[in-house]
């Protein structure tokens, strides 16, 4: 999904991004700076723009950047090339406080039509706007040699790992 969009698509680009124009130089929603678009001071996705909420129902939503940071810091992370015999590569997080385990597949990301990092990297959107530039949003990012969270272009097709919605 592109950030703030609720349907997958074949091509991911600024030209077909729902909330931007002019190659990402002007945002039409989720903008806090006059110089970068139409200001609405929204820092988190509305429910109707949350891919998890729209596709999986009211009990689910995309995590905030703070929740992704807590997940990152609250687990010991290991890379696997073959999670539980499935042949799927990704990161396994082992909770530092209980026996919970989470697996995040290295699903890559799509820019244009190509997913060149499938099996090598993972990128999981948060619901939070990137503070440094309005054309980016926060996401959890990893490969076998790093795991971190960062912000980057909203138009790219990245994964969504839903969390339970507390309503």
Indicate residue ranges for each PLM-predicted region.
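C-terminal, surface-exposed recognition/capping segments
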Residues: 1-29, 33-167
